Structures are given as structure tokens and as C-alpha cells.
Amino acid sequence: MCGIFGYCNYLVERSRGEIIDTLVDGLQRLEYRGYDSTGIAIDGDEADSTFIYKQIGKVSALKEEITKQNPNRDVTFVSHCGIAHTRWATHGRPEQVNCHPQRSDPEDQFVVVHNGIITNFRELKTLLINKGYKFESDTDTECIAKLYLHLYNTNLQNGHDLDFHELTKLVLLELEGSYGLLCKSCHYPNEVIATRKGSPLLIGVKSEKKLKVDFVDVEFPEENAGQPEIPLKSNNKSFGLGPKKAREFEAGSQNANLLPIAANEFNLRHSQSRAFLSEDGSPTPVEFFVSSDAASVVKHTKKVLFLEDDDLAHIYDGELHIHRSRREVGASMTRSIQTLEMELAQIMKGPYDHFMQKEIYEQPESTFNTMRGRIDYENNKVILGGLKAWLPVVRRARRLIMIACGTSYHSCLATRAIFEELSDIPVSVELASDFLDRKCPVFRDDVCVFVSQSGETADTMLALNYCLERGALTVGIVNSVGSSISRVTHCGVHINAGPEIGVASTKAYTSQYIALVMFALSLSDDRVSKIDRRIEIIQGLKLIPGQIKQVLKLEPRIKKLCATELKDQKSLLLLGRGYQFAAALEGALKIKEISYMHSEGVLAGELKHGVLALVDENLPIIAFGTRDSLFPKVVSSIEQVTARKGHPIIICNENDEVWAQKSKSIDLQTLEVPQTVDCLQGLINIIPLQLMSYWLAVNKGIDVDFPRNLAKSVTVE
């Protein structure tokens, strides 16, 4: 939820028009995350002024607002920092006054964009109101901007002219909750602060010259930092302030009635960032792109650095410095600059009408990529590099706990049975929010598996921290390299599905499913009794991409069904049993979130325990009738439906004589899909429902990629 984007150019001349276009384009590439308003902040015409443009609605509405305000687009800047934001309302309605950026005062001295929720904002707001500050919005973010101004003025009055990152540390000390934020200020021209806690942030670096090293050092205070003192001087520069213009500091008395005054950290481990050193020591032209998502950066650069929780990034004078308040045992001393594997074409629609449609049709390729290089079909071996060293520990586990939300939860449900069958380890599947609410007991001999497409899901991250505190081994199954879950877990698997832009997860679901099956296969490769079963599954996986391609040919038939039998329906029932129960739940979720039609996935065995009361000739029903050990029971459940005048649509295997015979005497329709191994059949069966949800939505004129009230990456509780 929400999206942050920032752009800083240093010794790279850009017009105001180019800067605005870069910021707006960055926001457009964050649209899929979900939002209800947008805004940007850039330097104004005067030396200490800031232009803020914000608007409710789409990014296109913001572009119209900027055009209406008619700023001089031809003014050029050799160095400049601009920030931008797409907002998902958490505090305050979607109104222009609540849009980000939020300002500290009418003079725009400090301007902030923020993702997350500040849980103590009411206390902060009360404190600031008592000190005379007037609030314009209902947001928690405005508290941050005003807190910046208050602490800046307080320290200035007491003789402390703070560096931007020192001031930010004081602000962060007062904040509780989660945040990813950017701040710019007229007091610190051409500088920007980026910091995160529980909300993702990355920084892209673009330079014509090759970087000297592929990392940035983390800078810590010295042991005696925290004691106010007169700064040391070296070469006319304040020690610890790098190439910035020297500032004079004086130790002043603290006023007990004000928030804490800075104990200046003059003795910082601070030097020119090694990554940005030039051969002759002259400044290097460079551009920085700060974002909550790699999709908005890849157009400009593939060199990115992922911030970790409590990192404080300070960009100024063409350099990037990363500060932390304290050194933790075992913490990394650097942040590596990585190369994104994402291609620009992957986040473009191409010939498709919607990203969701594109991603449905990418599944033959995405499922193949999930398995690429990991399965040896000739020798029936599965090798997951990220798990290999940890498998002996996992095999000794007392139980496996799979924790996820939404679609990722369904992929866990879909594979629970095969985990139990192959490993003989009890497996529980938990919704992250419920897991936390119950304070579920977790022990050191448990293995906790966290599944998330984005790797940033807030509830899943909180559950992960909960399990780490209790000493459990943690495994991450994610699609986003460098995400929080991938960094914090002990080991894991990257599903390699490629960027997924549509809010409704399609290809990530099938890739998660396959990654979990491969995990189960790896876990059981030491069991002689499971060899035949493992070979059957591995050979079944080999055929999956081709079988998905075959199922996609059903689209014309499904499109027609959506335009006739399912048109204008208010509710839909999906029946599944065994491995297909997860498919029923996932199919129902897709139809709900994309077409806004009420749909319910039901365990077929529970039909007669209440759900059967809903069945009549008007209720559309979709049932999974593919072949497995539970097929006779599924047939029995469907016969109960038809006996109550129900007219089910059966997803069955090709050339199945049972359904062919029944269709002669019972009013039912079939959608035939290829047959595969029972534990993999859900991969094939979900494709028709993805297509069905898509066409139901398109026929209603719904924006498939941006369903109302939903966000792609849920980074708040």
C-alpha cells in the first residue's frame, strides 16, 4: 500500500519539466500497489521555496493539476531533490488536504512523504498543538513534518545547528509504528533523507562513471557520541560532515519543557562514500532514485541498494551515506549495491489489455522459470540452493508452520498434504493475522515457512519477527529479491515468477505452489519409501508449463460463459475437496476481488452441513471434478447439488466418461483440463478460474488491474 518515489540529480543538469516528468513517471509505475491520491514536492522559484502539487484520484489527475498550476518547466537545476507519493488512506479521508507530501508549516520548511502508520501520532499531535502548531490535515504524516520543524527550531534556539541526518535521528526517536519516509527541507537544499522501519525502500544509483566499489559503508556513532561538545575542525570542515559546507555548533543548555535537544554526534564514522570516489577526487555527476518498489527504478538504472530497518540514508553533494543509531552484534557493516534482474519489458503490458491478462498468459513461462535449473528430470533430483544447507535441520523439526496471507495462504493450503505425505512431519497452515492474534506457541524445534509475493506483507513480517524471537528456524518463499522477508529469514526460495503488476495474484500463486512442492520434494529426498512418489511428481512438474498453455485455449469458451450463464449473477459457489479445496478458495478470492461478485469456496465434504441450503436452480455453482483418490466422494457431492435443481459447471479431466454420461441426464456443463499428478492438479484447475474472474470483471467495465479498495503490497496491518 502506498508508494514512495524520490529523484535527486547532482551535477546532472535537468529542467524542472524533466524533474516533474521523472517523478510523475515513477508514480505511474507504482500505481499497481494501490492508492487513492498522489502528490509531488520540488524546489520553487525562490531559493528557499518549495512547490507542492497534490490531487485525489489517479496520477493522470495529478498531471492535470500540475498543468493547471503552470510552473515554469524550463528552469534548469544542476542539483535538485524532489519527492513524490501515492497514498492509500489510513488516517484521514482521501481528500486533497490529506494527500502527501505533508508540510510542517505554510512556508513548507519541511516536507514529508510517508508509508506506514505512526501508532503514537495522537500523543504527538496533542504535544505539538500544545506548543502552538496548527494542523491542516487528519494524517499521521503531518505530525512527522511538524516534529521536524519543532526539533529543528528547538535545537537552533539552543545553539545546535544540526546536520539533516542528526535531526532525523531525533525525529525517529519520537516515532512509534511503521514507516518508510522521505523528507526534504529548505534548510537543507539539494538534500533528502530516506529511512525505513517495516516499510520497504530502495535506492537506485545512476552514474556515467563506474562506481569504485559495489557497496556503501554503514556509519555508526563513536562510543563517546551523545555528549554535546564543540566540533573538531579539519581543513575548514566540521569533522564528520564530509564535503558539506561546514556548520558551527555550540553546546547549549537543554530546556526540560521541550522535546530532547540533540547531543551532537560530531565523532561519526563519516568520510566520503567510497562508492562515489572519483580518480582525481573531483565530484562525480550522479543521479539517485529512491523508491518503495524496483518497478519504478528499473527504467533509469539497474544498480540498486536495499535499505534495512532503521537505516537512515542521507543523500547530498552527490553522495549516499547510510547511518544507524547504534551498532548491533552481527550486523552488516555495508549495504551492497546490487544489479536488478528485472527488465523494463516485464513491467509493460505489451499486446495485452491488462497486466492481469498478461500475467495469466505468462504462466507457462513463469512456472518453467520457477523450476529452471532446480530440477534434474533425468536423475529425478531437486536442488534448492537457498535451502540445501538447512535441510538436515528442517528434517529434525517437530512441526512445520506455514504462515501467509491471502493468495499466498491458499498456496500453502494447496501443498500442505504433500508436505505431510512426503516428510511425515505435522504441518499447520496459519493466516498471519490470526496467528498473531492467538499468540500461537512456537518452539525452537519448529520450522516456520513464510510465503509472500512481495516479501513485505506487514502481518507476515510481524509473524516472522514473532517466530524469530522464539528461536524457530524461518524459511522465506518470496518473489521479490532484496525484500524484507528474504533478508530476515534464515533461508528460503526465490520463486522467479517475474514482476507481478496486477493486484490480483495469478502467476505468483502458481509459482509459489511449485516452489512449495519442490521444497517438499527436497525434504524427502533421503526417504527410500517415497522414491516412486517423488519420481511421479517430478515428471509431472516437467509437463506443467505445456499443460497450462493447453488450458489457456479454453479462454473463448470461458469468455462466453461469463457473458451468458454467469452474467449479472450476484453470488457464486465453488466446491472442492482434497487438493482442490485450496483451488476453490483461491478461485473464489479471485472472483471476489476482481469482479466484485460474492463468491464462496466450500469444502465439498461440508456441503450437507449447512451450505446445501443455498442451492437452487438460480445459484451458479462451479465444482472441481478432476480425478484423484477422492473422486467418488466429489461425484456424490455434485449429485447432491443436481438433486436440488443445481446446474453446476464441472472442471474435469479430458475425456472423462463419468461426466460425459452424467451430462446426458443431468443439466451440467464441463470445462475439460489435462490430467496430472493429484498434488499438481490444482495448478491446472486454477487457470480457468483466473480467466473467469478476468472476463467477469471486463464485462462489467471494471479496471481489472486496480480493483477498488485493494492494494498489491499490503504493508500496513
Swiss-Prot record:
The keyword Ribosomal protein does not apply. GO terms for molecular function: carbohydrate derivative binding; glutamine-fructose-6-phosphate transaminase (isomerizing) activity. Keywords: Aminotransferase, Glutamine amidotransferase, Phosphoprotein, Repeat, Transferase. The keyword Nucleotidyltransferase does not apply. PROSITE patterns: GATASE_TYPE_2, SIS. Residues 2-318 form the Glutamine amidotransferase type-2 domain. It catalyses: D-fructose 6-phosphate + L-glutamine = D-glucosamine 6-phosphate + L-glutamate. Pfam families: GATase_6 (PF13522), SIS (PF01380). Its EC number is 2.6.1.16. The modification Phosphoserine is found at S253, S336. The active site is at C2 (for gatase activity). GO terms for biological process: chitin biosynthetic process; fructose 6-phosphate metabolic process; protein N-linked glycosylation; UDP-N-acetylglucosamine biosynthetic process; UDP-N-acetylglucosamine metabolic process. Induction: The activity of this enzyme increases in presence of mating pheromone (transcriptional regulation). This is Glutamine--fructose-6-phosphate aminotransferase [isomerizing]. It comes from Saccharomyces cerevisiae (strain ATCC 204508 / S288c) (Baker's yeast).
